[in-house]
């Protein structure tokens, strides 16, 4: 099967998830071409899984001090370039089109009257229509990267045909060394370090795109972005402080790491993700960098891990086999293999789900 896979490049979480699915698709025998959009080509890293991928400008949201900056977002849109990229992308050689919230591949499929699978956390809004999004946000989420078959990834199904998160396997089992990982790429680095320095009895490993070389600042180890170094730190940490992107939170849940999360203000997906995590008793949420909330969270024990099945392999086989099984059946089968910690199971029951 020949597949075109469009990957949203603005967040490392999208790339991480698609990297996991890329390995599974290759193992399933698929021949896949990848396109990425939304980021300067020089800013991609650890991209071996995508082979000779192509890049496009696409669409992306600009942030400032942890909030969506709509003025800068509008300024960076190159509408004529996007339209040209969509019209020039020939899909005739492909049996299947997949988009992980990537607009060029999705709109090209729409323009050429092709079916398109939308595999992303954002596809959840096609089913749940979150009130946190509002009417305008739901319209944006629907038409940013339109697909014919939305496949929503989520931490729980909420009574819909969603599927669990795709999580890569780890080479070693998780441990706890007492350190706390901090990954808040959309927040001001100075504000982050000022907050962490108020807790000298704890050791923090802070990864941030502004950091170009490793260094120590009191109780804070400042580290540049590196997938391998971050993964090693995640496996051994005693907790993680992050924005509310789907992929990293999913990994932390599967490893049994306690989570303190701050959604990027104005980023609809993250605001809704935070609300879901709170309602499921899976994480602690703060709306802004908050020393009182951090102090409370540091005193919490580590949770038990959430055990999700090998979703990437199941999904890859489902795609390559021609999607003969219904999405509802696939969803039910995957959730039947999912095991939640007792506190989460109790919360799910209290919400009316069995």
Q: Where are the predicted features?
A:
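A short, glycine/small-residue-rich beta-strand->loop->alpha-helix junction that serves as a flexible
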Residues: 7-19
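Conserved nucleotide-sugar phosphate-binding/catalytic loop shared by glycosyltransferases and other
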Residues: 9-12, 27-80
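Donor-nucleotide binding loops and adjacent catalytic segments primarily
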Residues: 22, 166-239
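Conserved nucleotide-sugar donor-binding subdomain of glycosyltransferases
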Residues: 67-96, 101-104
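A donor-sugar binding/catalytic signature common to diverse glycosyltransferases
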Residues: 97-103, 108, 233-272
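A nucleotide-sugar donor-handling region in carbohydrate enzymes
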Residues: 126-189, 206-210
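Catalytic binding pocket for nucleotide-activated donors in carbohydrate/polymer assembly enzymes
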Residues: 249, 253-303
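C-terminal amphipathic helix plus adjacent low-complexity
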Residues: 295-354
């Amino acid at each position: 099967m020949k597949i075109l896979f469009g990957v949203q490049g603005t967040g490392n979480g999208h790339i991480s998830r698609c990297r996991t699915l890329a390995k599974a698709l290759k193992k399933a025998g698929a021949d896949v071409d990848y396109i990425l959009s939304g980021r300067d080509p020089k800013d991609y890293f650890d991209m071996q899984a995508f082979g000779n991928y192509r890049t496009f400008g696409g669409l992306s949201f600009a942030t400032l001090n942890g909030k969506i900056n709509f003025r800068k977002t509008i300024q960076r849109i190159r509408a004529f370039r996007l339209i040209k990229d969509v019209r020039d992308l020939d899909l005739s050689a492909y049996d299947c089109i997949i988009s992980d919230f990537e607009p060029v591949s999705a709109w090209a499929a729409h323009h050429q009257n092709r079916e398109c699978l939308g595999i992303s956390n954002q596809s959840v809004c096609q089913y749940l229509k979150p009130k946190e999004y509002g009417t305008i946000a739901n319209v944006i989420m629907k038409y940013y990267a339109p697909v014919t078959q939305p496949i929503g990834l989520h931490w729980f199904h909420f009574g819909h045909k969603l599927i669990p998160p795709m999580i890569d396997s780890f080479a070693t089992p998780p441990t706890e060394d007492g350190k706390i990982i901090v990954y808040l790429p959309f927040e001001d680095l100075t504000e982050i370090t000022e907050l962490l320095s108020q807790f000298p009895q704890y050791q923090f490993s802070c990864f941030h795109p502004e950091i170009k070389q490793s260094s120590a600042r009191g109780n804070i180890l400042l580290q540049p972005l590196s997938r391998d170094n971050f993964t090693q730190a995640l496996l051994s940490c005693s907790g993680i402080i992050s924005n509310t992107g789907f992929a990293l939170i999913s990994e932390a849940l599967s490893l049994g790491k306690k989570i303190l999360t701050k959604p990027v203000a104005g980023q609809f997906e993250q605001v809704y993700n935070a609300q879901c995590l709170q309602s499921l008793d899976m994480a602690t949420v703060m709306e802004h960098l908050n020393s009182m909330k951090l102090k409370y969270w540091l005193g919490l024990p580590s949770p038990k891990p959430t055990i999700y099945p090998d979703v990437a392999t199941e999904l890859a086989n489902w795609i390559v086999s021609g999607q003969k099984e219904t999405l509802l059946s696939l969803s039910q089968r995957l959730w039947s293999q999912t095991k939640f910690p007792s506190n989460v199971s109790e919360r799910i029951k209290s919400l009316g789900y069995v």
